């Protein structure tokens, strides 16, 4: 079926419940996730059902307010390097920009959660509706802030403040973390020339590592009840570890995941702990929130080294293993409205 405006009274969707797969496609910037999503929409035109893509909210970031958020966050780092801003002031401004990045994701997530957050369903057929959302709020509230912390652009306190606003995920979320070898990743970054964006190698390595740590975090939680399991034996997250994460891509998608491989490990810091090494309660609540968000998210990895058509086919094939929920047919028009506004 062709993609576009969702039919409200189409004979194809007249049942009371519409089986829906909700996919968040994510990863470091410049890998090719957005192109893959667009190619899947095109490929699905020849299959039953409807596929809709919510792109990155560039209009919101670049044109809706007085400041271009994409260019602005890089400009802050340039001003810091030139000595025009102190490291402390630059960190505060960076946190402000990062919150601005998060705003449209939070708005969309809140809107869709009231529509798509029904119980999981088992459906062996192709879904009636596939929703592909370019990035989960985890990106702007957890992954990018942590990467900025690793490179020295943000404080750990600012990261925790952003993470505290992370929304809970309703049932049926599927997060695809896209990956790519570093050589091809850099080649694609140089080819896209997005205005105001810079190729910051330390930030790129940090993001690649953070997203793999996110994958390990989910794996760890599938075998353990909480981030508290093994916390007492976990070593303090050192400056050495922090520096390693920005120099090269060192975290791989291995089969085993220990607590030290997860995002939780970053917060084993003296300034966040009491005299016994236990995380202070308010900070612990933030990690609890991350754990609760991940509870309703399946996480997949997808290598994008192939052609756009091949990558789209691989993304589409993942649907057979994804969680599915239903949307009430009477709510389909709300999806259409959200798609129109978000564009």
UniProtKB/Swiss-Prot annotation:
Show the InterPro entries listed in the entry: Herpes_TK (IPR001889), P-loop_NTPase (IPR027417)
Residues of the active site are 56 (proton acceptor)
Q: Which UniProt keywords apply?
A: ATP-binding, DNA synthesis, Early protein, Kinase, Nucleotide-binding, Transferase
Do the record's keywords include Kinase?
A: yes
Tell me yes or no: is ATP-binding among this UniProt entry's keywords: yes
- Which positions in this protein are listed as binding substrate? 74, 98, 194
Q: What class of enzyme is it?
A: transferase
Q: Which GO terms describe its biological process?
A: DNA biosynthetic process; TMP biosynthetic process
Give the enzyme's EC designation: 2.7.1.21
One MF term in the entry's GO annotations: thymidine kinase activity
Q: Which Pfam families match?
A: Herpes_TK (PF00693)
Residues that, per the record, bind ATP: 27-34, 188
Q: Which domain of life is it from?
A: Viruses
SUPFAM superfamilies recorded for this chain? P-loop containing nucleoside triphosphate hydrolases (SSF52540)
Q: Which reaction does it catalyse?
A: thymidine + ATP = dTMP + ADP + H(+)
Q: Which family does it belong to?
A: Belongs to the herpesviridae thymidine kinase family.
Job description of the protein: Catalyzes the transfer of the gamma-phospho group of ATP to thymidine to generate dTMP in the salvage pathway of pyrimidine synthesis. The dTMP serves as a substrate for DNA polymerase during viral DNA replication. Allows the virus to be reactivated and to grow in non-proliferative cells lacking a high concentration of phosphorylated nucleic acid precursors.
Q: What is annotated about its quaternary structure and interactions?
A: Homodimer.
Which HAMAP family does this chain map to? HSV_KITH
Q: What is this protein called?
A: Thymidine kinase
Could you tell me which species this protein originates from?
Feline herpesvirus 1 (FeHV-1)
């Amino acid at each position: 079926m062709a993609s576009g405006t969702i039919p409200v009274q189409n004979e194809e969707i007249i049942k009371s419940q519409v089986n829906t797969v909700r996919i968040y496609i994510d990863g470091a910037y410049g890998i090719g996730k957005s192109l893959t999503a667009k190619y899947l929409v095109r490929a699905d035109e020849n299959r039953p059902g409807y596929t809709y893509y919510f792109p990155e909210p560039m209009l919101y970031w670049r044109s809706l307010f007085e400041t271009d958020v994409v260019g602005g966050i890089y400009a802050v780092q340039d001003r810091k390097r030139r000595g025009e801003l102190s490291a402390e002031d630059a960190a505060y401004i960076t946190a402000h920009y990062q919150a601005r990045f998060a705003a449209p994701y939070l708005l969309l997530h809140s809107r869709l959660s009231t529509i798509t957050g029904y119980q999981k369903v088992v459906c062996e057929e192709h879904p009636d509706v596939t929703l592909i959302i370019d990035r989960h709020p985890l990106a702007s509230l957890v992954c990018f802030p942590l990467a900025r912390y690793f490179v020295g652009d943000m404080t750990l306190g600012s990261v925790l403040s952003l993470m505290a606003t992370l929304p809970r995920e309703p049932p049926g979320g599927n997060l695809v973390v896209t990956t790519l070898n570093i050589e091809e990743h850099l080649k694609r970054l140089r080819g896209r020339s997005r205005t105001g964006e810079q190729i910051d190698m330390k930030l790129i390595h940090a993001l690649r590592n953070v997203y793999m740590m996110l994958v390990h975090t989910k794996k760890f939680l599938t075998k353990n009840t909480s981030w508290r399991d093994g916390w007492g034996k976990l070593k303090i997250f050192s400056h050495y570890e922090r520096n390693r994460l920005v120099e090269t891509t060192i975290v791989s998608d291995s089969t085993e995941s220990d607590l030290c491989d997860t995002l939780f490990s970053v917060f084993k810091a003296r300034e966040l702990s009491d005299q016994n090494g236990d995380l202070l309660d308010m900070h612990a609540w933030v990690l609890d929130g991350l754990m609760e968000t991940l509870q309703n998210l399946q996480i997949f990895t997808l290598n994008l080294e192939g052609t756009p058509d091949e990558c789209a086919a691989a993304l589409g094939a993942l649907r057979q293993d994804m969680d599915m929920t239903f949307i009430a047919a009477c709510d389909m028009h709300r999806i259409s409205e959200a798609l129109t506004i978000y564009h």
